[in-house]
Amino acid sequence: MLDELVKFFVVLLVVVEPLSLLPILAGLTEGSNDAFRRRMSFKAVTISAAVCVLFAVGGTALLRLLGISVDAFKIGGGILLFMLAIEMVFARESGVRSITPGEGEEAHHRVDISVFPLAFPMIAGPGAIATILLAFAAVPFGSVQFFAQLGVIGVVLVLTLALMLVTGPVMRVVGVTGSAVLGRLLGVLLAALAAQFVIDGVRGAMA
């Protein structure tokens, strides 16, 4: 179980990629006071937590309702995560987690940026939702592993919030370039993990 928890933690942390949020948060809150940035950060993470728990609890039932097998979702989810990995490594916009220029312009004029673009698609976006569905699909509801995985989601979101609350100092130390380099390195790791999801799904479907 520990191996599965560590794998889930690594994949979810790489997918959420808290450091990549910081330049966006800094840009969208430029000219605003620290209280506004803190309020948006807390609200975005709270909304993201609700979305993550919703899919963790009801995701398996949704797959069953749609007649989608766990193996099929591993293949589809793995491909989605691989697309996200390509976006991270080559800094290309695959649409999995990025926003369009028009959406970015709209976000700049929003009074509340917590739901869009912070909570979705940056924190609880398609990649994070797919990762959660993959992790919880084969775990019995109410089991020790089920609650342990909820704890992993909590840890990732707390780390994300902690970084968002210190956006200014972190950006001064790491910078946009440092954040981009780290994102590319994590993208390579995510690509390998995504490929493993697809391999496991194909192997399970053929068994």
Short names for language-model regions:
Residues 27-38, 105-110, 137-144, 176-179:
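Juxtamembrane helix-boundary/capping and inter-helix hinge elements in multi-pass membrane proteins
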Residues 4-21, 71-80, 147-160:
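Structural signature of hydrophobic alpha-helical transmembrane segments
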Residues 4-56:
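Juxtamembrane transmembrane-helix termini in multi-pass membrane transport proteins
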Residues 34-63, 139-171:
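A small-residue-rich subset of transmembrane alpha-helices
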Residues 1-15, 91, 98-119:
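Small-residue-enriched transmembrane helix starts and helix-helix packing motifs
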Residues 38-92, 97:
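Membrane helix-loop-helix hairpins that form the core translocation module of multi-pass transporters
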Residues 68-90, 153, 178-207:
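Selective transmembrane alpha-helices of multi-pass membrane proteins
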Residues 11, 53-58, 118-119, 123-134, ...:
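Hydrophobic alpha-helical transmembrane segments in multi-pass integral membrane proteins
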